[in-house]
């Protein structure tokens, strides 16, 4: 069993950096490991066009640690009013790589999202024409649908129809959480891929609910049964090029998580690759981690792979109880617990 693991530098194909005073902390945590990251656009107000994406990009670049080459890959936030012209202008910018479908009300800051999939068909047609990827938060939001069933319902009611209607559109089914989603992606064309988070590989709903409610495991899409967790582990460690790394690292201040009505999101960027390594090692599949973390994502996006590398060492360390987040603090996943892998510093 090797005590060192060297990988081509990975990228994060789904991350929330937030905005304002927190950026030096969130960008710094992402940049220590990742060469690039797909930046979620669900700010308030959201990132709806190329000009807003450029302004946000400049704020991220200004927050990078000294000497960092971390590259933010920007994303448009689709609304009912997103036009084909918005899509074409964003594609022409060179720095907007995708557009994100949030069903209205599905997750944090999604109130401006899409109320009916049909309303964005003109935008999707333009995206297919210019080669812009569609990123999907795949959950329905109707109150009568159980929260644990919302991903499967989205596949049945919407996603199947979208990929059939727009066969040349590249689609990323983000942060998949169910066996149903794995099977859908496996059966779909080569234009459909999926990201998988570290927390959905490492945990299931028992970890969140048995013995007390653990708010720092609460995320959307919510953790599912262990049979779904096993399906995700199978997919991530299979070597299938359709599955790749996307942390969905989503910081919320401690007081917003530890509350009567707590926010959804797990903060993992501080030790993302270490968490993935632990999940892959559980499956004796560390030899598959590099492809999942460093090859499949850029290949799907049509971007070059990174050329530098990172090294992990087998060394136990304790995750801090909290980390700075602007004027507040964030409780990271596994706070106060031990991780078995550690990133060698000074590699950015």
From Swiss-Prot:
Zn(2+) 1 binds at residues 14, 16, 100, 248. Its EC number is 3.5.2.3. GO terms for cellular component: cytosol. GO terms for biological process: 'de novo' pyrimidine nucleobase biosynthetic process; 'de novo' UMP biosynthetic process. Binds 2 Zn(2+) ions per subunit. SUPFAM superfamilies: Metallo-dependent hydrolases. Keywords: Hydrolase, Metal-binding, Pyrimidine biosynthesis, Zinc. It holds the Pfam family Amidohydro_1. It is an enzyme of class 3 (hydrolase). PROSITE patterns: DIHYDROOROTASE_1, DIHYDROOROTASE_2. Belongs to the metallo-dependent hydrolases superfamily. DHOase family. Class II DHOase subfamily. This is Dihydroorotase. The lineage of its organism: Bacteria, Pseudomonadati, Pseudomonadota, Gammaproteobacteria, Pseudomonadales.
């Amino acid at each position: 069993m090797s005590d060192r693991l060297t990988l081509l530098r990975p990228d994060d194909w789904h991350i929330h950096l937030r905005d304002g005073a927190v950026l030096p902390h969130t960008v710094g945590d992402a940049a220590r490991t990742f060469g690039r990251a797909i930046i979620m656009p669900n700010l308030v107000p959201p990132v709806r066009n190329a000009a807003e994406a450029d302004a946000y990009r400049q704020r991220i670049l200004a927050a990078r640690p000294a000497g960092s080459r971390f590259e933010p890959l920007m994303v448009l936030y689709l609304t009912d009013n997103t036009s084909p012209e918005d899509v074409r202008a964003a594609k022409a910018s060179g720095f907007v790589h995708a557009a994100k479908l949030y069903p209205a009300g599905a997750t944090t800051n999604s109130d401006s999202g899409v109320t009916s999939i049909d309303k964005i068909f003109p935008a999707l047609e333009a995206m297919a024409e210019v080669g812009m990827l569609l990123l999907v938060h795949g959950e329905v939001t109707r109150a009568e649908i159980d929260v644990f069933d919302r991903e499967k319902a989205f596949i049945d009611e919407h996603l199947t129809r979208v990929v059939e209607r727009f066969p040349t559109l590249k689609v990323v089914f983000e942060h998949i959480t169910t066996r149903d989603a794995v099977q859908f992606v496996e059966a779909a064309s080569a234009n459909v891929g999926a990201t998988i988070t570290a927390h959905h590989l490492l945990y299931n709903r028992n970890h969140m609910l048995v013995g007390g409610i653990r708010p720092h495991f609460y995320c959307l899409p919510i953790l599912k049964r262990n049979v779904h967790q096993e399906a995700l582990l199978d997919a991530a460690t299979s070597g299938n090029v359709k599955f790749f790394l996307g942390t969905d690292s989503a910081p919320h201040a401690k007081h917003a998580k530890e509350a009567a009505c707590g926010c959804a999101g797990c903060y993992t960027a501080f030790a993302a690759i270490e968490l993935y390594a632990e999940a892959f090692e559980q499956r004796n599949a560390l030899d598959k981690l590099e492809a999942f973390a460093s090859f499949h994502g850029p290949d799907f996006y049509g971007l070059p792979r990174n050329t530098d590398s990172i090294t992990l060492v087998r060394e136990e360390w304790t995750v801090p109880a909290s980390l700075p987040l602007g004027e507040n603090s964030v409780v990271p996943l596994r706070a106060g617990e031990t991780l078995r892998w550690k990133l060698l510093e000074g590699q950015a």
